[in-house]
């Protein structure tokens, strides 16, 4: 899980004070990754407000010492933005966290799913910030055997379960990750690829490259 996240804002102090005035809990303890205003978010994780970015420089310049062998501005492999980050919440808490983002930051709902499988089920509410750049699916299990429930037990609480990154060329980008030594999760069974044209008719994805 991720222990914190940071949002880029125009005025960090204003964003922090606004959130606290709406009921957010300010974080005033030790151990912050950045010396910027922060509130307590999902599962006790921190939500930082960062105003130093772009032409203003980087919020991390004064927090980390770059080593000689590290490049502070690496070329990267082709991932350019965060598409979304998912929260796993306890049963009955989805409305609580939906209200947290709605009341504090003006988020709106873009999708709602009630998925019932053969063995497990879940409810998912996808929400987005007013600017559309921050998307958060809130996931809540409907049984004791789901992946969400396993996460909550292993992590011992709610939290950020995964992040999804965006790219213009997913095959080239993932090939570069593999070349850099990243190990991927096991792929889906062969039937996933065999049935792909039935599920998504007319798709032109290169099946053999997908299998890699």
Residue ranges: model-predicted function:
Residues 2-3, 160:
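Eukaryotic phosphotyrosine signaling hubs
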Residues 4-83, 87-89, 94, 111-140, ...:
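Vicinal oxygen chelate
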Residues 59-61, 147-150:
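A short, polar/proline- and glycine-enriched secondary-structure boundary/capping micro-motif
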Residues 74-77, 150-155:
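Short, flexible, solvent-exposed loop/turn segments with mixed acidic/basic and small polar residues
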Residues 101-107:
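Long hydrophobic segments that form regular secondary structure
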Residues 138-149:
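Conserved secondary-structure micro-motifs at functional edges
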